Amino acid sequence: PADRMLAVVGSREATAYGRTVTARCAAHAVQQGACVISGGAYGIDGAAHRAALQAPAAPEDAADRDGVPPTVAVLAGGLDRFYPAGHEDLLRAVMAAGLLVSEMPPGASPTRYRFLQRNRVIAALAGAVLVVEARWRSGAQNTAGHAFGLGREVGVVPGPVTSPSSAGCHRLLQESPARLVTTEQEALALLGQGPARSGGAGGRTSTRAAPESAARPTDGLTMEEALVHEALPLRQAVPVDRITVSAGLALPTVLACLSRLQRAGLAERVEDRWRRG
């Protein structure tokens, strides 16, 4: 159930402070019968998964998890593509004790756009999202944006004002309805399992949406168009069948997407081959 699923996300370049806070929040959530969801990446993700796996179940909750796993990792590629490679052992441990999840077919490579898709899945699976460390522009903020759109609660851990690793956290607290989280109890309370917290924006309930990142030329693409665009090489043009395999889409769909991308200046045809525009 979503009310027992807490997503914990943040920077790949986590500080010792960020890893410590993450471990405390993740372990407490699992001890109270919740599941910790993250993306399997380095930094905050890895710290969240490890703490969830190592957390001893509280005696009164050990027999009452109702099949809720301690942790779930959402992958950007296929389930047979352990990424990052340095986390293969960790991801196998997550698979043994919890779940690995992906909406990509086996063999699909993790690409930039698929990481953004993964963030959407993390937000959708969770009842609430906790952002521990995030830079000014980060995937964690992207996950928070999806969570706001889905009506999920978002909590943010503040950091030193001098730390670039917390700049995105402070931005969320200033510009969005995110809630300030300073203890593991407040993190769990995002799921409705504890006392109410003060809102962001100085403790007031904010009506502002999550901060928007600067627009990219690809921001308006459909999912299929984005997959085709990701499959296009930057320099060496490739035949359509290669693009079809990389994108994991049917040939007619790829051809239609290539035509639209070409009109938008995002794809270039070189004889019977294609590359990015």
Model-inferred region functions:
Residues 1-277:
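Glycine-biased, small-residue-rich flexible motifs in mid-sequence functional cores and linkers
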